[in-house]
Amino acid sequence: MRQILLILSVHLFLFLVLFTYHVQADEDQWYVEEFDTFVVTAKNGEVTHGDKLRFFMNKGDCSRMGILFSFTTMKNHKNIQSLQDKTLPIKINGHQVDDAAKVILVQNLFRDMNIVMMQAPGLKSVKDMINAMMAWYEDKNFFGIELVSEPGFDPQDYFDITDNNWKLDHLPEKIIEAQ
């Protein structure tokens, strides 16, 4: 009996050590994925882990990139699909963004869970975008996006969590890898 208890204890200890290491490794993990015509570099959020910040480049022009980000919501708003193709106001690191973000996908996952994917406007020079984002990141030590209110739209109506942050450590290297 003692041997069985010892073996179970050792297995449990090893499982916890490996699990803890895996969780810590995922916090700083970047994903670089190649698709038919574009490459995506992505990072999980700190507030909501499943919400990703994605940088995408067309394989034919790796000098310009765009940004996609998602917000998951558990609010069961009956008109959440009405957000499709809308432009929503956002703040980045507390600064209002004039061009806002366009909703490109509203996807129901489960009965009460939806993912809303948005795109920051336009493709920008990789160099200029990385420099601007890293300046914001180094100033506050995070890169945060917040959904904000405007006349006719209150993000609290649709989203239970209206902000997320991402660590951008190693972003320049990951973009170079994606290029």
At which residue positions do the language-model features occur?
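A generic "folded-domain core" signal
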Residues: 23-179
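Classical Sec-dependent N-terminal signal peptides that target proteins to the secretory pathway
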Residues: 1-25
